[in-house]
Curated annotation (Swiss-Prot):
Mg(2+) binds at residue 99. ADP binds at residues 47-48, 100-103, 169-171, 412, 499. PROSITE patterns: TCP1_1, TCP1_2, TCP1_3. This is T-complex protein 1 subunit theta. There is a cross-link at residues 224, 254, 260, 534, 539 (Glycyl lysine isopeptide (Lys-Gly) (interchain with G-Cter in SUMO2)). It comes from the Eukaryota. Its main location: cytoplasm. One of its GO terms (biological process) is protein stabilization. NCBIfam families: chap_CCT_theta. It comes from Mus musculus. PANTHER family: CHAPERONIN. One of its GO terms (cellular component) is chaperonin-containing T-complex. Component of the chaperonin-containing T-complex (TRiC), a molecular chaperone complex that assists the folding of actin, tubulin and other proteins upon ATP hydrolysis. The TRiC complex mediates the folding of WRAP53/TCAB1, thereby regulating telomere maintenance. As part of the TRiC complex may play a role in the assembly of BBSome, a complex involved in ciliogenesis regulating transports vesicles to the cilia.
Amino acid sequence: MALHVPKAPGFAQMLKDGAKHFSGLEEAVYRNIQACKELAQTTRTAYGPNGMNKMVINRLEKLFVTNDAATILRELEVQHPAAKMIVMASHMQEQEVGDGTNFVLVFAGALLELAEELLRIGLSVSEVISGYEIACKKAHEILPELVCCSAKNLRDVDEVSSLLRTSIMSKQYGSETFLAKLIAQACVSIFPDSGNFNVDNIRVCKILGSGIYSSSVLHGMVFKKETEGDVTSVKDAKIAVYSCPFDGMITETKGTVLIKTAEELMNFSKGEENLMDAQVKAIAGTGANVIVTGGKVADIALHYANKYNIMLVRLNSKWDLRRLCKTVGATALPKLTPPVQEEMGHCDSVYLSEVGDTQVVVFKHEKEDGAISTIVLRGSTDNLMDDIERAVDDGVNTFKVLTRDKRLVPGGGATEIELAKQITSYGETCPGLEQYAIKKFAEAFEAIPRALAENSGVKANEVISKLYSVHQEGNKNVGLDIEAEVPAVKDMLEASILDTYLGKYWAIKLATNAAVTVLRVDQIIMAKPAGGPKPPSGKKDWDDDQND
């Protein structure tokens, strides 16, 4: 008989075998802070225009080469529970603003690093949390005073492109002016009078070959497909969209046909042909000259489409079908019935084109008032185009933020240094032990210009002391000059290096909330992970759509 070994008394006695339990400052708080610091240190070197790229290979063995913090974190699949909180804060920033995810990580990491110093010299966790919350509230009071300008006209391409440059610069340094112009053209062309801008209305089509400066904007949609039939170009297109295969009706039951004479054999397929002819003729009779289908195209149906001079395009993706319906104003029909006028879409031209060596079908609106705009990106490698696409997403999201709030604050560390200066002064006036936490909160803002300086290869301490001396003289808009070879500063407003007010507001709020949440944890209780076989890797799931 096996000997029963009693469990050690205490918390472990209540839990199943294999459960872990950590408590207290040393085991829980400092461990959590260490994990968050490591995470912030990872993405800190990727901050700003001179940030380094990370090469991430995810569990599906897909390669990512990027300095976009949101992508890095999404593919890393962080497991540590405290670090996950910081990751969730950065995801919230991405959902709310679409940019500034790395700011949240770097700032939250700095807050926790400085909180550890305070805890080690004897402050209690509650005093640190209280000080951080007071300082965060003060930062939000000061932030509106730091607004240096506002966007005047969001329908002016030149003005919009100058405002988008900063967000694109951090991802594609050197190409930001060209990309900002492309994104501005795409956004302005579909910006509705109501002011409700939808980021999903800007599509990206990536075509391998050439270089980034061969990219272009098109009002309408571009698909990497070839037309099915002989017709390759249609002007003033009337489009019928079908979500079903372009084929004759097939009965669900299997049948056996008994043929007695040669004449019956001759007439057997003729009836099917006549039926298909009548169906395609009826569709052509409504005025439709382009058919888009979401399924297979039968050879006989293709023959009659060519006979009635109808252009035929096949889209496997149901998402592409939906977007096309939105672009041309069509309704997707579930059966091969002739569409009524209200169900047909309209487009100025549909044509087959060749970009590089890739065949594309273009649905184009001549007037700049279409529902969807497409940016056609060119690049030498897939990884490069993926990274450019992420820069485009940031630019489009920045435009969306500007439609909500047109205020802008100076970039390049200028806003952070001014906040640090003013919050430090405020901390001096506060009684009680919270003042130490308030001053450390102000010091945490230095992490942003410090990261920019270190990534640019200049001495961070020299730059920060220069910034403080200039800001003490009242120059609120002066930030780090990342293009200078020596530590230098310049006016961010004159250089058009501007950040959105909303982006900064939410980043400070979310980073502080995440840091405070991590500090509030004094016990970690982890159950034993569930066993069981792992799902097979590399194989598709049984219910995934199979593309024909």
